[in-house]
Design a protein with these regions (language model features):
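Active-site neighborhoods of divalent-metal-dependent phosphate/nucleic-acid chemistry enzymes
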Residues: 75-114
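Short, well-structured N-terminal submotif of metal-dependent ribonuclease cores
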Residues: 1-39, 53-65
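Short glycine/serine- and small hydrophobic-enriched flexible loop segments
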Residues: 49-52, 111
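Short loop->beta-strand "edge-of-pocket" segments that line small-molecule binding or catalytic clefts
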Residues: 36-38, 72-75
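Glycine/charged-rich beta-loop-alpha catalytic/anionic-binding loops adjacent to active sites
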Residues: 28-29, 66-69, 85-93
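Acidic active-site catalytic centers that drive phospho-/nucleotidyl reactions
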Residues: 7, 46, 103
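Amphipathic alpha-helical segments within well-ordered protein domains
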Residues: 9, 48-49, 88
Length: 114
């Protein structure tokens, strides 16, 4: 079984049919149906924040997150002080990169989950 990590970039393209990467996200979703998808609560929070100002897309984002929460093929890793601290340390230690804090939390989560 294939295991993949779905980040904010993917979910934004998946939710917004007008996103320039929407078609690629839909094609990738077909591949994901045969595997296990991992994401984090931090990623989902970032996605919801991204769509906060557009009523129609906000509604789509809420519906998508609700579906993910009940989908047994999607493993949503909960937020924790440990995930924040680990991501924060990577963020603080890499001033040469333009990683967001959520990117750093995601990278640390992928390392931890294998």
């Amino acid at each position: 079984m294939t295991a993949v990590f779905a980040d904010t970039f993917y979910w934004i393209a998946f939710i917004n049919p007008l996103d320039k990467h929407a078609q690629a996200a839909q094609r990738f979703d077909d591949v994901l149906s045969s595997g296990k998808v991992y994401t984090t609560e931090e990623v989902l929070a970032e996605v919801l924040a991204f769509f906060a100002k557009d009523g129609w897309l906000r509604t789509r984002a809420v519906a998508t997150v609700r579906e993910l929460l009940s989908d047994p093929a999607v493993h949503i890793i909960p937020q924790s002080h440990e995930s924040f601290s680990s991501g924060f340390e990577l963020y603080a230690g890499r001033p040469d990169k333009e990683y967001s804090l959520v990117d750093c939390i995601s990278m640390q989560t992928m390392r931890r989950e294998g």
